[in-house]
Amino acid sequence: MRWLTFLVLGGLASAAIADSANSVRVCYNYGCLVEQEVHYSDSQLAQLRDWLGVARNADEERERLSLAIGQLLAWAGQQSPISADRGGNFADDGVYGRMDCIDHSTTTTRLLQLLANHGWLLFHRVAEPAWRVRYLFELHYSAQIEEIASSQAEGGDPARFVVDSWFRDNGRPAVVLPLANWLDGEGQVETGTGRVVTGGFAGSPR
């Protein structure tokens, strides 16, 4: 019977590892004050795998990442109060489940790492969150990726891009911009436009 016990324990351990690989802790209520684990099903992640797998180059992968992050946040909103999150910090002021740029940069970095851990980012690697300061006191953070091909080029700095989900309502595509443009202040808050994706993965921008 001992072999049966080991078999059961081994199966449980494998299931736990698989479950962990499909889970992410999302932050909300500003400053990552609250964290909640959300779990993505195999079928949900398979949709994203197929969606990202079509990308033929880094430009296309960034375009598809924009929608993929929006979808992951929408699915997370089905298990947590972040469905109430709106672009910027004013449209959802005081709402439980609201997210500031710290919540977004932390959560989106974790979502990007989830995709990377599955091997679905072929043209980018996940970098540390970026930050910018405007008007002395306006500090803003964003998740960040760097292009693999450019980082491997001799003598060249890697091309970096922000993946900023803070600008949009929950479920909307994340804003993806060259880091230099973002540091110069690009990126506009959009709210009240409705979700691009609800329920299942849309498969293409609308």
For the regions a language model picked out, list residue spans one by one:
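Short N-terminal segments immediately surrounding and downstream of signal-peptide cleavage
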Residues: 19-37
